[in-house]
Amino acid sequence: RDPLWSRGLGDVYKRQVLDTARLKYLIGEHLKVDNRSVHAFIIGEHGDSELAAWSNANVSGVRLDAFCEMRGHYFHEESEDKIYEEVKNSAYEIIQRKQATYYGIAMAVKRICECIIRNEQSILPVSSMMHGIYGMEDVVISMPAIVGKDGVEAVVPIELDEEEQEQLKKSATLLKELNTMIKTEHGVK
């Protein structure tokens, strides 16, 4: 069995779909709009180094900060931090109440499978090998990608501000270090 799967890391591919859905839901709730009109992504490694791509977020094509102001919300950083922390910690809260997060994970897997089976060409934040995007090489990390009948058909290099690019690179470095550690532990070259 693959060492990544035996360490519980094989489920990384679907988690950003779930966290992105949570992010869109919370932004929609905050702004009192249908979350299907919210376009935002959680990217990177699932866990402490994941990040919300705020600079790319929008509501029906209107930049998120401008839409927030249109709805009477002016404390962007404070609201973004609160929403992000809620997304990041939601799994822990669900586990405390239900002892597991399998329903949300099942819905994320269902969504990915629908995209593949129906050849939807939907853009989802799924993990795939990076080849030069933001300087990342030979690392599997979650980024928006077109998902269709062949799985990940193309990674979508969304615009990120400098701080987000640095956070993403740190996330990639963390994953590379973890991969090296696992390979070393299992004698894989």
Region locations from a protein language model:
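Short hydrophobic/aromatic-enriched beta-strand-loop microsegments
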Residues: 11-14, 35-37
